[in-house]
Amino acid sequence: DKVLWSTPIAKANAITELKRRDYNPMPLKRVNIRKSNGKLRPLGIPTMKDRAMQALYLMALDPVAETTADNHSYGFRKERCTGDAIHQCYINLSKESSPQWILEGDIKGCFDHINHEWLLNNIPMDKVMLRKWLKSGFIFNKQLFPTEEGTPQGGIISPTLANMALDGLQTMLEAKFHRVDLYSPKRSYYPKVHLIRYADDFIITSISKEMLEQEIMPMVKEFLQARGLTLSEEKTKITHIDEGFDFLGFNIRKYKGKFLITSSKESQKKFQRKINEIVNSHKTIPQESLI
């Protein structure tokens, strides 16, 4: 709508407009950005007013989301980052007795395909407002398109909605693989099944490839199906720790029993490309200034 709140006065005046009554969000502006693999990622950009309204409701929703979140969910959460997720990988996989098999999970178009009815039935917030945001549509090439599924990447509240849709997977796995010590019933343990998730990227560990294929994978697929989601066949695979796997820009493996965490080859290539861009765009400046 070409409206900017660029001054303190404009922002102060805008506060008085943030009312639920007669509020109707504008369609999102669709912009495609290119990912590192060459594919395009659609972003939905809301107006300033819609962004502010989402932020207002997020202030109430976020504390609720934190109380129901999986313990080992690290994406789009305060005081958590990729480093915490990688540290949890070290805790779960570094010991000699640690699980050896890993399911590398990637959800296909997570933000674009979350089922609207599931969100409306399960997200504890104003249903009228949530429905308006989910059904606001988007404009691309000057044409208006409806939104029948998904929550747009670019919306302030979208990461929290996606996280809440995926929360519960860890609890489900723990309930399934919970074991009670026969000799000491008060003690319990889990047979090396651990979930570590960052947004829509996750890994699940296990003692065997068969357990991942025959028990865990069907559970994950059923969990996602209820939310309108599926696993990416291209990116989801089962790997032995000795072969190593890439997760959040790092490569994690064991070599001759030693646990190693290094930057992934793709991360190294991305870093090299960035350096090349900087050098090529500053060819005329002195060497000491470039460094």
Q: What residues fall within each predicted segment?
A:
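Amphipathic alpha-helical blocks
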Residues: 2-27
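Charged boundary/loop elements
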Residues: 59-72
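Active-site beta-loop-alpha junctions of metal-dependent nucleic acid enzymes
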Residues: 78-82
